[in-house]
Amino acid sequence: MAGAKEIRSKIASVQNTQKITKAMEMVAASKMRKSQDRMAASRPYAETMRKVIGHLANGNLEYKHPYLEERDVKRVGYLVVSTDCGLCGGLNINLFKKLLADMKAWSDKGVQCELAMIGSKGVSFFNSVGGNVVAQVTGMGDNPSLSELIGPVKVMLQAYDEGRLDKLYIVSNKFINTMSQVPTITQLLPLPASEDDDLKRTAWDYLYEPDPKALLDTLLRRYVESQVYQGVVENLASEQAARMVAMKAATDNGGSLIKELQLVYNKARQASITQELTEIVSGAAAV
């Protein structure tokens, strides 16, 4: 029965793990709903800012802000949003693969890349592969604030202001639904012109008070900050959804494994009983 005892021990171990994954699935489901609420609350502001900036990028402005001007590209920067925790399926690695492919495309053109990381998984991954990480922030928890994110944003904006970066992108997962999260790379600077046909057909005239430079400096920085914050809350909702799905799959796989082990245990026990009966019958026949 040594084999049967070993199998019983494995079954108990899988059952304990199954309880943990089931609990993590339920926690992730609860956190996902809260993350979706935050994402839905901030999305209108981010989208409105994007529309306003789209008007500016399409317009003929009396003052041309540096954030609106295309440059010869020698260095590009990425604000990379990843998770602080694992156990969320392929969410991070799919994002990193997309980013590495984009970085390689720039590298083949002789363009250098700098990375500002939001989330510990991105920090550890790109440090291990030799990425040029110039800023990082980790441990933001389940309710990140803009003040926690502002460090890497300031570093990249300062580099852009000083001409050390010619393009700036944000890299994050876009939440579609519980089963679908899409890795995206979105250009922040220089500001891309709006792709909305209605905006392209509309002529916009702006009056600036008191000064266009001061107003645009503030507005365009707010735009970048809003897009980064939206990327973070969308990535957080994606993380919880991916973790919930991964933990459900682990729980289901645990159930299947328990059934297989139970079948093996029953066969081992049956074989042991058969052997004992055979020995008893053989002994009786010998007598």
Swiss-Prot record:
Subcellular location: Cell inner membrane
Pfam families in the record: ATP-synt (PF00231)
Domain of life, per lineage: Bacteria
Disulfide bonding pattern of the chain: none
InterPro entries in the cross-refs: ATP_synth_F1_ATPase_gsu (IPR035968), ATP_synth_F1_gsu (IPR000131), ATP_synth_F1_gsu_CS (IPR023632)
This protein's record includes keyword Heme: no
Membrane topology designation: Peripheral membrane protein
A GO cellular component entry from the record: proton-transporting ATP synthase complex
Gene Ontology MF terms in the entry: ATP binding; proton-transporting ATP synthase activity, rotational mechanism
Principal place of residence: membrane
Database matches in SUPFAM superfamilies: ATP synthase (F1-ATPase), gamma subunit
HAMAP family the record matches: ATP_synth_gamma_bact
Subunit relationships: F-type ATPases have 2 components, CF(1) - the catalytic core - and CF(0) - the membrane proton channel. CF(1) has five subunits: alpha(3), beta(3), gamma(1), delta(1), epsilon(1). CF(0) has three main subunits: a, b and c.
Role played: Produces ATP from ADP in the presence of a proton gradient across the membrane. The gamma chain is believed to be important in regulating ATPase activity and the flow of protons through the CF(0) complex.
NCBIfam families for this protein: ATPsyn_F1gamma, PRK05621.1-1
Protein name, entry field: ATP synthase gamma chain
Species the sequence originates in: Salmonella typhi
